[in-house]
């Protein structure tokens, strides 16, 4: 999954405009990494601890808690993806974001990559609301990262290039999710599945209008599913 894969997969994504030299450098990925690091640093300052930063006021206000979403705090569906619990958590996710994202951003383009990232993040959060404990605190960019895994896999499938390494990475991470305590299976699988659907629209649909429409419909479906589920609990 190194830079060499950019040259082989760039032709897999339909695009109309020729690429400029500036388009070969990732911009969104470094910005996302910087934003995640800044949020982590702020929670650590508030909590006065790198390890126990979940005690920060910002963390409590932004973390995904299905019960809080039911009370109208819908922003948590996205803000939770920029929170991390401890240095190891953010280090692993930011490394994965960089390794996966630097190539995908160049291949998909900045706007489509950011859309894939955010829709995958929303998919992971939706799965937590639908299937996890309603009073559970969930945080992290892992749902979005799993969506990027799906994105890279589908790009390679589209180009008919070997994708066994990506499948192995996905399986390994799912196994880790299952065996390591405290990791949200719902969030990871939700990001993987929803990211796959979003990536399929971006990779296989030829017209930008169709791509945008598919992502909007997917987003609306996720929000409707959450709203219906929460209404049924009331």
Feature locations, PLM:
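C-terminal transmembrane module of polytopic alpha-helical membrane proteins
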Residues: 1-21, 178-234
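N-terminal TM1-TM2 helical hairpin plus the immediately adjacent luminal interfacial "cap"
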Residues: 25-141, 181-183
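Residue-level signature of the transmembrane alpha-helical core
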Residues: 37, 78, 118-122, 144, ...
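Alpha-helical membrane-inserting segments
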Residues: 38-42, 123, 127, 131, ...
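Short alpha-helical packing/oligomerization segments
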Residues: 68-70, 76-77, 169-193
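Alpha-helical transmembrane segments that form the membrane-embedded catalytic/substrate-binding core
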Residues: 90-97, 139-151, 183-203
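Alpha-helical transmembrane bundle and helix-membrane interface signal
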Residues: 106-107, 152-167, 203-215
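Central hydrophobic cores of alpha-helical transmembrane segments
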Residues: 117-120, 165-174, 214-221
């Amino acid at each position: 999954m190194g830079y060499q894969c950019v040259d082989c997969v760039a032709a897999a994504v339909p695009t109309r405009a020729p690429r400029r030299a500036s388009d070969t450098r990732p911009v969104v990925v470094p910005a996302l990494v910087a934003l995640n690091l800044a949020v982590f640093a702020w929670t650590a300052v508030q909590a006065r601890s790198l390890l126990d930063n979940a005690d920060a006021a910002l963390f409590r206000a932004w973390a995904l808690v299905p019960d809080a979403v039911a009370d109208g705090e819908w922003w948590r569906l996205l803000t939770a993806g920029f929170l991390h619990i401890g240095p190891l958590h953010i280090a692993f996710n930011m490394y994965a974001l960089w390794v996966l994202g630097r190539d995908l951003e160049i291949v998909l383009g900045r706007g489509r990559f950011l859309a894939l990232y955010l829709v995958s993040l929303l998919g992971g959060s939706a799965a937590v609301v639908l299937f996890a404990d309603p009073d559970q605190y969930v945080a992290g960019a892992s749902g979005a990262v799993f969506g990027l895994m799906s994105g890279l896999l589908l790009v390679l499938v589209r180009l008919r290039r070997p994708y066994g390494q990506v499948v192995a990475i996905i399986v390994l991470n799912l196994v880790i999710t299952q065996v390591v305590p405290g990791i949200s299976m719902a969030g990871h699988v939700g990001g993987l599945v929803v990211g796959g659907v979003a990536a399929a629209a971006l990779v296989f649909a030829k017209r930008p209008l169709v791509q945008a429409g598919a992502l909007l419909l997917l987003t609306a479906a996720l929000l409707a599913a959450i709203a219906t589920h929460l209404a049924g609990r009331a």
